[in-house]
Amino acid sequence: MFLEMLNPMQYNVTIMVPETVTVSAMPLLLIMGLLLLIWNCESSSSIPGPGYCLGIGPLISHGRFLWMGIGSACNYYNKMYGEFMRVWISGEETLIISKSSSMFHVMKHSHYISRFGSKRGLQCIGMHENGIIFNNNPSLWRTIRPFFMKALTGPGLVRMVEVCVESIKQHLDRLGEVTDTSGYVDVLTLMRHIMLDTSNMLFLGIPLDESAIVKKIQGYFNAWQALLIKPNIFFKISWLYRKYERSVKDLKDEIAVLVEKKRHKVSTAEKLEDCMDFATDLIFAERRGDLTKENVNQCILEMLIAAPDTMSVTLYFMLLLVAEYPEVEAAILKEIHTVVGDRDIKIEDIQNLKVVENFINESMRYQPVVDLVMRRALEDDVIDGYPVKKGTNIILNIGRMHRLEYFPKPNEFTLENFEKNVPYRYFQPFGFGPRGCAGKYIAMVMMKVVLVTLLRRFQVKTLQKRCIENIPKKNDLSLHPNEDRHLVEIIFSPRNSDKYLQQ
């Protein structure tokens, strides 16, 4: 009787055994599943790079870009994992490439013409599917690019020489406006004013307040750089991005007023040929329905900010190098005397200024301003044996490539690096291919014009032991001097041009 009473309990215990085993095995099975998931994530890509680690890897890599800046983070990861490696930005797989053959492949093919960046960030600065610089709508970009190419080549390039020379001379005559009580010249401000004035005369032709707009351009650039790869959560907290939004609005409102003045000028012109330029072509395209008002305003904004944003800093670095290397300055001046003499530079002189060109190239190689290019793959591909999926982000680390391959003295500033013709696959300061810089030819000519005109009139000096290496820099979207800190002081000493050039 007693044993019979125990039987149900015995049966119940027997039934409970598999349930107990199943429950106790669950944590083990979960751990095994997670390990399998991690293993799959780690082994799914043959491209070197940090591990996925349950999503922690993407968070850390994106955080590093936000903390260090895009350019500095790219150099860090290429140094850590090699010249073709993979990280994540905003959770998206991103390749960082500093290998010339891979870079050549990306620049060459049309399925890499799209850019990448935060959609919210690009919308905030007006570049999302608009303008030319970061327009990631290939169809609209193809519609807009010909307007830039027409303005930046051919007759526009020829006219630029005379316009730029006059602008430089006028600003040098007013050098006191950018010189402090100690005699130091604010070269960055001087160059930004010259670049803006020249761009305005060539592409818009409406009187403007240079000082006010230069400051607004700096605010716009800071917003662009700050917002480009910010995560979406950043834009859910309005007080975090409000100051950037204001900076963008300040410049866009200013440009809108200038464009309206241009529209009025075009509408009331007695002779239309007197006001034909880049802005006029865009306004006519809007009237035909090819572009919107927003397209026109953004294109003009980007045309006006391009030179003050990058070329002014490039020229600032070049003048520091001239001051640091007197033997290079002597070679440049000798060539100026031989080719140009005591007259203003002309378009015919440009191709004969070989030493000046080598100096410009070596300066851009040794101390670049724009040292990376951001692209997105529009279709599946294979680059140097590595599979690349459609939608993959790509950063071309051009500045690092210029220090790794081909050049005999890659870590030194010397014109010897350009004594021989450099194959263009190894030197790409402006990029090439279907999405290469539209302004690369006019930029080279403009830099020659500025250097020749300025160096014939002034000798550039810095304080002893102050040089380009001493400048605090920020390597983010581009490499700029940190203007929040004290920059290297530069003195412009007038010289007897004829006597000096003949030495």
Swiss-Prot record:
InterPro entries: Cyt_P450, Cyt_P450_CS, Cyt_P450_E_grp-I, Cyt_P450_sf, Cytochrome_P450_Monoox. Heme binds at residue 437. The keyword Manganese does not apply. Coiled coil: none annotated. One of its GO terms (cellular component) is endoplasmic reticulum membrane. It is found in: Endoplasmic reticulum membrane; Microsome membrane. This is Aromatase. It comes from Mus musculus.
